[in-house]
Amino acid sequence: MSNQRIRIRLKSFDHRLIDQSSQEIVETAKRTGAQVCGPIPMPTRIERFNVLTSPHVNKDARDQYEIRTYKRLIDIVQPTDKTVDALMKLDLAAGVDVQIALG
């Protein structure tokens, strides 16, 4: 596992959850002796929706809603076997989507 790299992508609607989860991953990787780059904050995706409040007239009366998707990127440059085992056993919050890629 000396020349490999682990890239972890995190997505969440709550920025506190994603920061907490990324901190847990970084601490776990550093504890096992791996070199870590990140967490790198990626651009936040904002989806905005405008909804008419009135069913018939009053087009000026609208409600506005938005969904923010926060993303973080963590690179583990020199993972050890202990690092992979520790990351597999790590229990993260339910509101965080985790994608792991080996490269």
Swiss-Prot record:
Keyword list, A-Z: Ribonucleoprotein, Ribosomal protein
GO cellular component: ribonucleoprotein complex; ribosome
Origin superkingdom: Bacteria
Biological process, per Gene Ontology: translation
Presence of keyword Cytoplasm: no
Coiled coil (UniProt feature): none
PROSITE patterns given in the database record: RIBOSOMAL_S10
Entry annotated with the keyword Secreted: no
Listed SUPFAM superfamilies: Ribosomal protein S10
Transmembrane segments: none
Molecular function in Gene Ontology: structural constituent of ribosome; tRNA binding
Pfam family, one: Ribosomal_S10
Subunit (UniProt): Part of the 30S ribosomal subunit.
Family according to the record: Belongs to the universal ribosomal protein uS10 family.
Role this protein plays: Involved in the binding of tRNA to the ribosomes.
Protein name from the UniProt record: Small ribosomal subunit protein uS10
Source taxonomy: Bacteria, Pseudomonadati, Pseudomonadota, Gammaproteobacteria, Moraxellales
